[in-house]
Structure formats: structure tokens, C-alpha cells
């Protein structure tokens, strides 16, 4: 679509991700604002250029990361589970919209004067989940999707994993376990506000379609502890870096990121409790 409307502003470099990033850095150094659209799984090929050509020089580049999270049907090599971990190491602003409205809004924001330097937005393969489309876009860094007056447990996630989180919340409610639900849009860096809001809870479950080591959840737990929080943090993420060729539902079940496993994780935390509730 963009290529046909703006042929002079579209450059297809083929399967040369390293060149794509260095090329974008050169454009940015001349005052342009390039958008680099690459699959998450191929984005890692350009990590050297992301660090040295863009991040260290604070070049004005927007990274649009496609196929983020679990990817069905494309094989083992196409899982987009590493970019939150390796981008958060650079302190780069990272956003993960959960529906079309958020994607449209935040991409426009990243292209505005509100930001300067490298920044990234990630989105999954396929269309939006109907369960998430209804929430629209508030323009906030995070939103409460469910909020109870007496909840001491909060479930947090981003992008497509939120659908399973909402299903888990409904099942927990039926078991008389009240949980709030937070939809994160800005993944990193964390704001003081979200740290303050999360610090009010005794149990936090953070679920993400990402490798656990270096992930958003791992950074969040550390930030909370540095802020003096001493509650129970449940991190549901990918512990085995090699995922099989399978459907998203099968991968979620295998990695413990389906609603059933999330419910079980919260129930175990409540049962063990350590007098937190």
C-alpha cells in the first residue's frame, strides 16, 4: 500500500536486515525519519547495527517489528520471542499495541516530535483479537481492563497474550479469586506511575510471549524490588528458547501461557500464600 502511494519513499532491501538498519541510520543522520519494518525473527540479525549505527548515535529511527510473539505455521525459526529482551537492554522505548486502534495511534505518536532517537513498536501476525478490539485506544501507557475494589492480585500482559489473561481472570472470578487486569502498551522503560500502581498489590502475575531471560517481566520484577516491593511475582514466559512448529494454542499450552496454566499459577500462589492475602 505504502509502496504504491509513495514509490519514492519505499526501499525494499530484500533479506539484508543489517543493511536495512544501517541504511536507515544514514537516512536519519541526514534529517529524515525512516521506519524500518522487519519480522521479529529476522530483526535479531541486525543487532550489531541496531546498537552501533542507531542506538549509540541516538539516530531518529522507528522500528516496526512484525510477527512479534508466537507465530503459527511458519516454522521454528519464525518465533518472535527475543526482541523485547534485546531491545530493553538498550533502554529503547518499546510499545506493543493490542488492537488496530492502538497500533494506528502509537505509530503516529512514534512518528511525531514527541519522540527523538530510536524507538520501536511490535505487533503480531494476523488480525486483531476480537476480545481486545473492544477496548479501543485510550492513548495511555497502560490501562486497567478489570478493576475490583478489594483485589490484592493483578494480572499483567501485553498484545495477544491479553486474551488468555482475560479468560484466566474470568475463571478465577468464578473461583472467588478477585483479580485486576492491566493491559500494558508501553513495555519499556517503565514509568514511576506503573511501578507505584503495581506496588499496591500482594501478588503480580506477568505473562508474555517472550524469552524469560532479559524479558520485560524480569526487568519489571527487579524495578519493583528496587522500589521496596516485597510481594509475590509470578512470571509466565518462555523458558525453553527453542519452540516447536505448532499452532499458537499448542505453543501457549506447551509454555504455560494459556488461560488454564495462568489460573493454576495464581491458585498455587494463593494456596501457598505465605500470608500475603
Feature map (PLM): residue ranges:
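Thiamine diphosphate
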Residues: 1-117, 127, 274-277, ...
Amino acid at each position: 500500500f505504502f509502496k504504491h502511494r509513495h514509490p519514492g519513499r519505499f526501499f525494499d532491501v530484500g533479506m539484508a536486515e543489517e543493511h536495512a538498519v544501517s541504511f536507515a541510520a544514514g537516512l536519519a543522520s541526514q534529517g529524515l525519519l525512516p521506519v524500518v519494518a522487519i519480522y521479529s525473527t529476522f530483526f535479531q540479525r541486525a543487532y550489531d547495527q541496531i546498537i552501533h549505527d542507531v542506538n549509540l548515535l541516538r539516530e531518529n529511527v522507528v522500528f516496526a517489528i512484525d510477527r512479534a510473539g508466537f507465530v503459527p505455521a511458519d516454522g521454528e525459526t519464525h518465533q518472535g520471542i527475543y526482541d523485547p529482551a534485546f531491545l530493553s537492554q538498550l533502554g529503547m522505548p518499546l510499545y506493543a499495541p493490542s488492537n488496530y486502534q492502538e497500533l494506528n495511534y502509537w505509530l503516529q505518536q512514534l512518528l511525531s516530535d514527541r519522540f527523538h532517537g530510536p524507538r520501536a513498536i511490535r505487533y503480531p501476525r494476523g488480525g486483531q483479537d476480537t476480545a481486545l478490539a473492544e477496548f479501543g485506544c485510550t492513548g495511555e501507557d497502560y490501562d486497567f481492563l478489570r478493576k475490583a475494589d478489594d483485589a490484592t492480585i493483578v494480572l499483567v500482559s501485553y498484545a495477544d497474550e491479553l486474551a488468555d489473561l482475560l479468560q484466566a481472570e474470568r475463571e478465577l472470578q468464578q473461583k472467588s479469586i478477585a483479580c485486576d487486569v492491566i493491559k500494558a502498551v508501553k513495555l519499556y522503560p517503565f514509568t514511576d506511575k506503573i511501578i507505584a500502581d503495581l506496588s499496591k498489590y500482594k501478588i503480580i502475575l506477568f505473562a508474555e510471549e517472550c524469552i524469560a531471560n532479559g524479558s520485560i517481566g524480569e526487568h519489571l520484577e527487579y524495578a519493583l524490588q528496587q522500589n521496596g516491593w516485597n510481594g509475590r511475582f509470578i512470571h509466565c514466559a518462555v523458558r525453553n528458547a527453542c519452540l516447536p512448529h505448532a499452532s499458537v494454542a499448542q505453543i501457549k499450552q506447551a509454555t504455560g501461557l494459556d488461560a488454564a496454566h495462568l489460573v493454576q499459577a495464581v491458585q498455587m500462589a494463593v494456596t501457598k500464600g505465605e500470608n500475603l492475602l
